[in-house]
A protein has these predicted regions:
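Short beta-strand/loop segment that forms part of the nucleotide-sugar
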Residues: 55-66, 81-85
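Conserved donor-nucleotide/metal-binding helix-loop-beta segment in metal-dependent transferases, i.e.
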Residues: 138-171
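Catalytic core and acceptor-binding pocket of nucleotide-sugar-dependent glycosyltransferases
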Residues: 181-266
Length: 283
């Protein structure tokens, strides 16, 4: 990331913001996962149930139909959604094969599929739904929709130029924010998503899914961001700093211990997969 973006974020985070008044409208929560996410998911769920200030109608887990995932959903009062039912095809059917050069290749079909699920508006019954990464843990109360129905976006200092290059392909006239919407969580409005799908399809003449797939740079490991695309597309919104802390798996503890230790200075914690070890989460 650039030094300029770091400075902009710090200035933004140091500002004093008025308290947000949350909407009373219920929301759904939609979490796409694969089996390896089950170790960290209990902490994510506890954070959602403790810190999302809106009424939650249902929590949906979108995943492969594997016995351990279905059993986890039954044990934790979650609604399981077979990932192949969302679009009528499986992640592997995207065939997103990458060429990194020097004989190195990769398959990002599953990674992109989860992003398309978040953008689909096809899961849940509420107009608004919160998507959150399985390794992200909320430790302070979060408002995602204000009482005048503006979406709240929690801004970060992430900076990855291929995301912005991709957006310029999809929607060339879209003005981009000087901070990042990549925040591990986002509230989606199905009405806004309809407009986004239409705008993407109008630009290309193809379906929004095919347009995104065709726009992906096959030489780039991470060439698309659903959060950057949607956040920049929504016009009526409220922005706040994310105040997040990234931690290695060796720092895992039960939820209350994490909350007591970090909530004085941070609003959320993330335990990235690349910092993962074979550790059982305490719940």
């Amino acid at each position: 990331m650039s030094q300029l973006r770091k400075i902009r974020y710090r200035l933004f985070a140091w500002r004093s913001f008025p308290k947000l008044q949350p909407a009373e409208e219920p929301i759904d929560v939609v979490i796409p996962i694969i089996a390896k996410d089950l170790k960290i998911l209990p902490l994510c769920l506890e954070g959602v149930r403790m810190c999302v200030v809106h009424p939650i109608k249902q929590i949906y887990i979108v995943a492969p139909a594997q016995p351990e995932i279905i059993q986890f959903c039954n044990d934790h009062q979650l609604q399981f959604v077979d990932e192949t039912s969302v679009f009528g095809f499986a992640p592997k059917d995207l065939h997103l094969q990458l060429d990194y050069g020097n004989g190195l290749t990769g398959d990002r079909s599953g990674w992109l599929f989860q992003q398309l699920v978040k953008l689909s508006g096809k899961v849940g019954t509420c107009r608004y739904y919160l998507c959150i990464d399985a390794d992200h843990v909320l430790i302070r109360p979060h408002v995602f929709l204000t009482n005048d129905h503006k979406t709240v976006f929690y801004m970060s200092y992430e900076e990855h130029q291929p995301y912005y290059d991709n957006i310029h392909q999809l929607l060339p006239e879209l003005k981009l924010h000087h901070l990042s919407y990549v925040d591990h969580k986002m509230l989606f409005d199905k009405e806004q998503l309809k407009k986004l799908h239409q705008a993407i399809s109008k630009q290309s003449g193809e379906s929004w899914i095919d347009t995104i797939l065709n726009s992906y740079n096959r030489h780039c490991h991470a060439g698309f961001s659903e959060f950057e695309l949607y956040g920049n597309f929504v016009m009526e919104k409220v922005c706040r700093p994310w105040l997040q802390k990234r931690l290695p798996y060796k720092c895992l503890a039960d939820y209350e211990t994490l909350r007591r230790k970090w909530s004085g200075s941070r609003w959320s914690l993330t335990f990235p997969d690349y910092m993962r070890q074979n550790i059982t989460v305490q719940v």
